[in-house]
């Protein structure tokens, strides 16, 4: 506030006070009809001056206060609009995240089912392969066992045949034939 406007306000306030005091004195002094008109005019003049002085004195601060109030209300409204827009954006983002989460859950479920089916198929294939390997090994092992048993039976048959042949020879060969065979054998080996 400038010095000039402050001085003017003080001057107006003093003039208003003097006029009010004058009108108060005038209203006490008169008692007749002409005095009533004067009193009414003084009061009217007093009201006009008081109203003018108050208007002059309060116009600036009141205007600034109302302007500041208007600005605060406008700022509050703008801030409320921004907060509402921000809340709506966050709400839309949350709604989108929920929709995305539902889609992700469905995708994960489908992926897990597919992976589970593949895993079951792999396990079945491995089990079949292991069963085939076990069968093949059992067949080879049985073939080896059969071959070993054949060889053993063959050896046993040869041994039994030799024993039988030896017994028959012992029964059929006389001691003279035996001496002759030994002599022949010694001659052949001695040569």
Swiss-Prot record:
GO terms for cellular component: plasma membrane; proton-transporting ATP synthase complex. The chain crosses the membrane at residues 7-25. One of its GO terms (molecular function) is proton-transporting ATP synthase activity, rotational mechanism. CDD domains: ATP-synt_Fo_b (cd06503). F(1)F(0) ATP synthase produces ATP from ADP in the presence of a proton or sodium gradient. F-type ATPases consist of two structural domains, F(1) containing the extramembraneous catalytic core and F(0) containing the membrane proton channel, linked together by a central stalk and a peripheral stalk. During catalysis, ATP synthesis in the catalytic domain of F(1) is coupled via a rotary mechanism of the central stalk subunits to proton translocation. Component of the F(0) channel, it forms part of the peripheral stalk, linking F(1) to F(0). The keyword Membrane applies. It is a single-pass membrane protein. Pfam families: ATP-synt_B. Belongs to the ATPase B chain family. This is ATP synthase subunit b 1. F-type ATPases have 2 components, F(1) - the catalytic core - and F(0) - the membrane proton channel. F(1) has five subunits: alpha(3), beta(3), gamma(1), delta(1), epsilon(1). F(0) has three main subunits: a(1), b(2) and c(10-14). The alpha and beta chains form an alternating ring which encloses part of the gamma chain. F(1) is attached to F(0) by a central stalk formed by the gamma and epsilon chains, while a peripheral stalk is formed by the delta and b chains. The keyword Transport applies. Signal peptide: none annotated. Keywords: ATP synthesis, Cell inner membrane, Cell membrane, CF(0), Hydrogen ion transport, Ion transport, Membrane, Transmembrane, Transmembrane helix, Transport. It comes from the Bacteria. It is found in: Cell inner membrane. InterPro entries: ATP_synth_b/b'su_bac/chlpt, ATP_synthase_B_chain.
């Amino acid at each position: 506030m400038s010095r000039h406007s402050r001085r003017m306000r003080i001057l107006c306030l003093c003039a208003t006070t003097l006029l009010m005091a004058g009108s108060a004195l005038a209203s006490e002094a008169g008692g007749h009809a002409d005095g009533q008109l004067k009193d009414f005019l003084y009061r009217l003049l007093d009201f006009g001056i008081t109203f003018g002085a108050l208007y002059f004195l309060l116009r600036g601060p009141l205007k600034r206060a109302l302007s500041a109030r208007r600005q605060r209300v406008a700022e509050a409204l703008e801030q409320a609009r921004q907060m509402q827009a921000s809340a709506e954006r966050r709400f839309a983002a949350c709604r989108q995240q929920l929709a995305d989460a539902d889609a992700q859950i469905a995708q994960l479920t489908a992926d897990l089912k597919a992976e589970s089916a593949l895993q079951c198929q792999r396990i079945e294939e491995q089990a079949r392969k292991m069963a085939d390997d076990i069968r093949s090994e059992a067949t080879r092992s049985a073939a080896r066992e059969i071959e070993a048993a054949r060889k053993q039976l063959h050896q046993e048959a040869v041994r039994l045949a030799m024993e039988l042949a030896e017994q028959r020879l012992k029964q059929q060969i006389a001691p003279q034939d035996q001496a002759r065979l030994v002599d022949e054998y010694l001659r052949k080996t001695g040569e």
